[in-house]
Amino acid sequence: MHPLWAFLLGLSLTNGLSANCPGRCSCDSMQSVQCYRLMELPSGIPSTTKRLYISHSRIQHLQLSNFTGLLALEDFILLASGTESIENDTFKTLSTLKTLELWKNKLRQVPSALPANLEVLKLNDNAICALRGSEFEGLKNLKVLELKNNLISSLSPSMLSPLASLQSLMVDGNNIESVVGPLSLPHLKYMSMENNQLHLIPGNVFTSLQNLQFLSFSGNFLTKIPINLPKSLLSLKMERNQLKVVRFRDMKHLENLSHLYLSENFLSSIDGAQQLTNLTTLEVSQNQLQMLPPRLPSRLQKLDCSSNFIQRVTAPEFQDLRDLKHLFLDNNVVSLFEAGALQRCSQLSNLALEQNLLLSIPLRLPKTLARLDLKGNAIQDMAERELRDLKQLQVLNLRNNRISALDFKALEGLPRLRHLYLDGNPWNCTCSLLRAREVLKAKGTDVKGGQCAAPAERQGESWMSSKKILRQCEHHLQQSEKSKETKKKPKPEDSSSIRLNMDDDDDDYEID
């Protein structure tokens, strides 16, 4: 076809489509209609429409006649439109409807007589008080049910029993005080009941949930982890509850569990986690731990113990954690960090030690570290021996410490350093500090901070960018360069010692 004819044909189709599109709506060739700020559901929606999206309108009531002729409709989304009521059987004749989303409205109950082919039902942010099994009758294909942020007070088997194919259930942010079991949902994989009023979970709730993989009870009032959890579980979230103890012996059958979240509870100790042999993530931040958990699972990759009261870091807690990649110990009271405590963690890339009581950078850290956060300690020095093996380090955060000088040799030993954070330290801006600046500029490191606290005539200047300091120290830098060149110049009568010295220099850059 000639390009001109193709253009004219496309133009005519577009004009025809726009002509059939209701006001305040946009229609596209993908059979999708989007409407905004309506007072009622518009008439004249194309009969071929598969997706109808209406948002931020004032549609108080939906009725059967609104959908007459929309026999191809697959997705209907009504968002933030003030809808309070829906006529009985409004959606019943929409046999092709697969997704129904009625978010942020004022519905008090689940719409009745929903179409049998429905797969996704989302009624979040309404005013639904109760669920009745009759509302879900015939929904054998429903896979996703979301009822977040409503006013539901309880869950029972009779409410959900018609949903034989349900795979995901989310009822976060309700007023649920009780759950009655067993919930007969054999295909359920994901269940979230966050931010409710639960104090106790009966042991029989999970009897028929043998395919459940992800479970969250975060933000409730539970004092213990529910018993008889399904063996299929991969992830368990119990943050923001009232746990004081975790009985791992009641969880040892969870051989597939890989993620356990216990942050923001009242745990004073964690012991026995090694029984969860496949655990890769353990988060216990914002508890009352005074020591690191002993005997952790050997496959652990992430351990978050931030915001506790941990004082010491020693080698025994980490001797079997060869797969550990991320360790968070920030906001504790760590004052003792045993040299080489993490040497067995041969894959550790991220170590967070901000806001502790460290006086120096820990010695013999893993060579694999890419990020090291030491903000807000009492570190006074940055020595070459503390950093010499960290050839992979890319980010070093030393904000808000007591460092006044930098060893430029320590910086030379960090070939991959890309980001260095130095603000909040009392820098003594002598000319020798500019050697460190030259090293950092040569490697292209992004440096944040570095304001001089001394001497008095340089207070407030930045030793990384101040031209004034550079001019004052120009002679010192030239002398340093000449001294360096003199040391490098070989003596003909002692070539063997030169080679030896060069090898020694190379050793400074190698990883043992």
Curated annotation (Swiss-Prot):
This is Nephrocan. SUPFAM superfamilies: L domain-like. Keywords: Glycoprotein, Leucine-rich repeat, Repeat, Secreted, Signal. Glycans are attached at residue 66. The gene is Nepn. Residues 474-484 have a biased composition (Basic and acidic residues). Residues 1-19 form the signal peptide. Belongs to the small leucine-rich proteoglycan (SLRP) family. May inhibit TGF-beta signaling. One of its GO terms (cellular component) is extracellular space. Residues 474-512 are annotated as: Disordered. It is found in: Secreted. One of its GO terms (biological process) is negative regulation of transforming growth factor beta receptor signaling pathway. LRR repeats lie at residues 45-69, 71-93, 94-117, 119-138, 139-162, 164-185, 186-208, 210-232, 234-253, 254-276, 277-299, 301-320, 321-344, 346-371, 373-389, 390-413, 415-442. N-glycosylated. Expressed at highest levels in the kidney, where it is primarily detected in the epithelial cells of distal tubules and collecting ducts, and more weakly in proximal epithelial cells. Expressed at lower levels in heart and lung (at protein level). Detected in skeletal muscle. It comes from Mus musculus.
